[in-house]
Amino acid sequence: MNKRRVFFGFFMLIFFCRALFCYDGVMAGQNNIKIARTEYFDIIYAPGSEKSAEVLYENADGIFTELSNLFGLLHTFRLPVVISPSQDEFNAYYSSAPFSHIVMYDTVPPESFAVFSETLLSTFCHELIHAVTYNLHNNFWTAVKKIGGDAYNPALLTITSGWAEGASVSVESSGGEGRLNSEYHKQLVRQAKIEGKFPRFSEVQGARDVYPSGQLSYYFGGAFSAFLQQKYGMEKYARFWYKCVNFQTLTYFGCFKKVYGFPIQDAWEEFYDSVEVPDVSCDPAEEDWCAALTAGGKNGNLKNVSLVCASEEGAAFYDADSASVKYACFGRGKTGGSFEEGALSRAKTVCTQNDVSRLNISSGGELLAVSYTSLSGRVPKNKIRIINTKTRRSFTLKESGIRDGTVFFADGKWYLAAVKTHSQYCTLNLYSLTEGKNGSVKKAVLVRQKKFGFGKGVFSPSGSSSGRVFYILKDGMEYTIRAFSALQDETEWTVPLPEKDMVIQTVNVRAGADGTERLAFSFTRPGTIPRLALLSADISGRKADFSLSTRDSSGGIFSPSCVSGKKYVYSAHFFESNAIFTADLQKMTFETYSVRISEFAPGLQNAAALSAVSPLPQAVSSGTQADSPFPEFSSASKPFSPAKYAFSGPHGTFVPFALTQSYVIKKSADALEAVLVPFGISYITGTPWTYPLFGFSAGFNPLTESAALLAGIYGGTPQTELLSYYALLQVEFDLDGYKQAYGALNVSSKIALGGRTYLSFLQNAQIFEGRQGLIEIPENSEKFFGALKSDDETHRVLFTDRTSAGLGTIKKSGKGFYDYSGVELSAVYMQNWCACVSEPSYEYDGYQNIGLDFTAKNSALLPLFAEVFLFPSKSYFLGALAECVFLTKEIQKSTVKMPFLYANRFTLSGYYMGKFTHGWRTYMDSWSVLDTADYMRYLCEGDFYYYDEACLSASFMLTPNIGGLSRPAFRFELKAQFFYRQHPDPDQNHYSASICGITVF
């Protein structure tokens, strides 16, 4: 084999990967990216985000100046801001690695996050607050960053996510908008106090890894920061941040005491006292108008349900823990319950779907629209599937970018109305549905389209059998209820809200027998918990009557649906879970208001000439006509080159050690061992949207008397599991010249096929060529320099590859941390090839085989895990593993005396593992899978060696509650294990024990 050809081919493969994935991450699939520079920002945007980029171009510098003055920023800085319309899931983030940058997902926020009049600018402000607060550095740390890079930030050692998000949420809400001025978002803090589960200050810093997990940092951190700013002033709050980010104290609680003069727990108690809650029972079922809704069967308790919708025939609900959409009919089930008694028949799973955002059922319960976020592509995309509740057959619209679907039957036809989003624009789409023979939907055709201006939000459309579609329109901070007819002319109607400060969510409509439309939705006034609102709309009479409930209840009222003239079903949100209840209107008290319905005809666009997959307009004014970009912005926009940007200017981080290693082939000739070549320097850079990351390293080791150069790339699709990859090349030299070269390529992918089923792929390839050193210093060696050098000048080549492909259904199946269910079957192709290049007459070692791996998980009684593998390596031909979690105790606590440590859970588990070999310490031949029948015969005849191991383990899962480590992604597991081996390996004992710590990140 020609080694030059081998390495040239491997280099071209890595180069091809770099070119192929240059636009991965949030810019996946984007071309013609542009950049517009302001005084402080590089605004980088993709086609489709021109208007959003223009808005930032005009306002970003002013927001930065305002925040700099607020926090007393000493040293200004320049920051890239990336705007991408690729994905439909609203979000944004700031990161200082490998250099400071902000990434914004340019899409309309969901209904639950409609808390700003100008969402784009307010979201940018939120992330810019992170950038400003994390960079409140003095002269010393500013100089360190200029030399080493933005990642040298001591705030990462002191500031937790509770403080980081607290600063952003509190400041974004200081102007009267934002989450702290939304009663829906204040609900979590109030609910914790109502239930007596108010957490300590050390328990909201980001370490909690069960629901409500990450929400605590935003809501409790934001409310606490706002409390400090309002009571003790912004100057002290900014000084606290300044001391933390300049590492003037080791911990945030030590810094707090220095700045404020008293312990943080005292301030937290004051904050607790300041939280106002209504005088209600923690259990809403104690109210005379409320009853818990249950379903028949063993799992009839509906306490972990996040979404609900109901018709006159039944109710559908979503269990996010098991990703199951379930449906149950009203009336007498196997338990003898009826709806009047607050019960459903036995619930059946109609589909399995992750990340469901809304459920909407037709008035007769025949069809169910499931709006969800698909993670099967490069970026998250909003999709809608329609399910027949009787046959469970489903139809998924090919179009993406659509959400908040509602399905209804009118004038002999089925229709679907949905909101399509692109950048900061909404379009209300109406589809005509065609049924198949079995009653399921087989086709959807776009028939009408209503366009809205930049920044206007359209939420929760709901269609009735009258043919009218009602929806919520948010313009700035003003809410109205709108309606249009799917059957008649282009007339639209507007129903104004009776009070200016009302905020509403989740409209559900049913047509009344008297020709009126009856709507149910939740609403808030300033200072209230979400309540029930009813609307009777007489379109022909141009009159609407509101009935607003007057009392708060624990958990609030979310997603109410009418099931009869007297009863409504709704979801209540508690601190640690959600539950479904029924409300009896006859026992509730309401305030009534009457308003006039206005009629207008703006012109719904008939879609006869439209295609369901045609792109939406990308620059639409507040009316309906396209705007030309601002002249100054157009002239400032230039073509953008990711490679040029990454490798020019201070766009990376220097690390004062090397990432290089010196490799040695193991005696088994099928793998490599490594010795660090640590003394040197590394440089890490990437695109302004983080991925891909590029790394370069140069290192030296005096023990090997060698130096190495390394280049690598890491990237993929971080929002989904479609692709993850890394590739690297390394060359090592010593005093004799070229020593060795090493290359590695790792690619993994998981492709969702629908429901629980997925395909998984994994490849891990390595290639080595050259001379080797030593792994350990010889006992008789007296020298330091060159102690790991070898006299063996033989050049060898090693190539290893392990490629697997699997089909599986393993998914989360319950609320428990270890609750997973499903199976997976994988086929693994293994090969390794080792040869002596300097002496071609030597025979080479090679091995190829195919193995099978079957995995099963179930958590019906206890979390169980079982795995059987056939030919997993060349050492043994059959193995099995069974593991059980006997006990899991959720702790989720941190003490006042030890706030730097968060206890997640205690686990007691055990496993049994066994493996069969044919011959003691012998290796199997290539393609031994073809001799499976012979190996099975050896097994039956007892002609094998058997080794086993049983283990009982007790572990505490802990999270460091300091700095950037205070997050579920970084955990420390303290584990005590006892081993028993009936048939031990020759180098093992029958009994052993160990205490160890395992870091997981």
Regions found by a protein language model. Give the residues of each.
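Outer-membrane beta-barrel initiation region
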Residues: 284, 579, 584-717, 813-815, ...
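A flexible loop/linker signature enriched in serine peptidases of the S9 family
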Residues: 181, 319-326, 351-355, 371-384, ...
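Conserved blade-ending motifs and adjacent loop-strand segments that build the rim/top face
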Residues: 496-505, 545-561, 594-602
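Repeated scaffold domains used in trafficking and secretory/extracellular systems
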Residues: 303-308, 355-361, 401-408, 454-462, ...
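Beta/coil-rich, acidic/histidine-enriched accessory regions frequently appended to metallopeptidases
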Residues: 24-25, 32-37, 61, 212-215, ...
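Acidic/His/Gly-enriched intrinsically disordered linker/tail segments
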Residues: 25-29, 97-99, 116-123, 131, ...
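C-terminal transmembrane beta-barrel domains of outer membrane proteins
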Residues: 668-684, 695-717, 725-728, 740-746, ...
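Juxtacatalytic substrate-recognition/specificity segment
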Residues: 23-154, 160
